[in-house]
Amino acid sequence: MSPQTETKASVGFKAGVKDYKLTYYTPDYETKDTDILAAFRVTPQPGVPPEEAGAAVAAESSTGTWTTVWTDGLTSLDRYKGRCYHIEPVAGEENQYIAYVAYPLDLFEEGSVTNMFTSIVGNVFGFKALRALRLEDLRIPPAYSKTFQGPPHGIQVERDKLNKYGRPLLGCTIKPKLGLSAKNYGRAVYECLRGGLDFTKDDENVNSQPFMRWRDRFLFCAEAIYKAQAETGEIKGHYLNATAGTCEEMIKRAVFARELGVPIVMHDYLTGGFTANTSLAHYCRDNGLLLHIHRAMHAVIDRQKNHGIHFRVLAKALRMSGGDHIHAGTVVGKLEGEREITLGFVDLLRDDFIEKDRSRGIYFTQDWVSLPGVLPVASGGIHVWHMPALTEIFGDDSVLQFGGGTLGHPWGNAPGAVANRVALEACVQARNEGRDLAREGNEIIREACKWSPELAAACEVWKEIKFEFEAMDTL
């Protein structure tokens, strides 16, 4: 390179490393309506100031790299860079801060959750200046959410398809989750649906194993659905898990489900990936299929309080990517779910407009505009004694899913389903009459036992079962 060229190239450019906060910490910045906003829980390494840590997150998740590069002069960093615009300490925690970062909308591909996460959480979590990092919340502006189809159908369309109103929907995961033949699996599906459930479900790891290939399972489950519908006069469904090793195979399974005329399929959206999930959601809308979403692997990402991604972010991402149901914890069962936090992201799934509410872990006001809502699914260690609490906590727009709480009934699968349906109907009737489910729940269930021997037997079996552990994820 000639001296003249060197001079031209170096005008306005100084090589070397400089503090991130000089460029990416901008406390005077006023956020725009079109910005994607993020709240990160930051734990800096000893000796790293919180402003530098927050700026590093903004830089490494947007335009920055570890050193100054001369190609910065070929673009407008002020237009494209992420900005850490506010930092606050976390109450009760030592050396933890909430860093608020604003990202310009032009950094993200339209309609792509994959691209959004690749930018915001793709690389920065391994950054050495940080001891730990957790994405607590995202504000998705309408300008971005409108580029997504979202759920294939949404809550109201699902109710219209099923012709079921005024109560939560009832489901059951077929157990044992692995090992049944397709014919025996279909038998269990029929018995549960015939007993009064609305849905049965493939477990998340039921795909196409040697003991039960997917096509055989789909056929026997479809037979069970049609037989139960004919005998009950109600529309029934089974979540046929279309999750597969390739997107092509996944769509092939969904196509076969549509050809069978069943109402709903299922996908494991985290293990399957957002690209696959969005593709399946588009297929489901185009072909009239409901889409049930399982969150297998979520606790690997969201359970640690100071590192990872909070489930409220994964829930928002699912609403954008597409799904009509998603598992959302129970508050009362065997799986993690602190009440106020759970209700916070349940509202983020169902409602059109959600106000900022730090008491429920909601860091930003979220306006979904016209994006359809998602039904939260309560599943995991629940039984008939939990029915009043579940009905009170989740309300009508939910799916209450009892696996062992149906199939573990001492008289069999169908009586287990009867017990759950009777308990639910009793709780809904009591609520509609103005009774307090939280205070009178046990009494309501005992009253219903008098005219349902199936419910009485279930209550006797599970009267002592409790899952009482301290929640990991608290405010």
Swiss-Prot record:
Annotated transmembrane regions: none
Residue positions assigned to the propeptide: 1-2
Residue numbers carrying N-acetylproline: 3
Keywords: Acetylation, Calvin cycle, Carbon dioxide fixation, Chloroplast, Disulfide bond, Lyase, Magnesium, Metal-binding, Methylation, Monooxygenase, Oxidoreductase, Photorespiration, Photosynthesis, Plastid
Top-level lineage group: Eukaryota
Post-translational modification: The disulfide bond which can form in the large chain dimeric partners within the hexadecamer appears to be associated with oxidative stress and protein turnover.
PTM-bearing positions, type N6,N6,N6-trimethyllysine: 14
GO MF annotations in UniProt: magnesium ion binding; monooxygenase activity; ribulose-bisphosphate carboxylase activity
Catalytic reaction list: 2 (2R)-3-phosphoglycerate + 2 H(+) = D-ribulose 1,5-bisphosphate + CO2 + H2O; D-ribulose 1,5-bisphosphate + O2 = 2-phosphoglycolate + (2R)-3-phosphoglycerate + 2 H(+)
Function as written in the Swiss-Prot or TrEMBL entry: RuBisCO catalyzes two reactions: the carboxylation of D-ribulose 1,5-bisphosphate, the primary event in carbon dioxide fixation, as well as the oxidative fragmentation of the pentose substrate in the photorespiration process. Both reactions occur simultaneously and in competition at the same active site.
Protein's recorded name: Ribulose bisphosphate carboxylase large chain
Lineage: Eukaryota, Viridiplantae, Streptophyta, Embryophyta, Tracheophyta
The encoding gene: rbcL
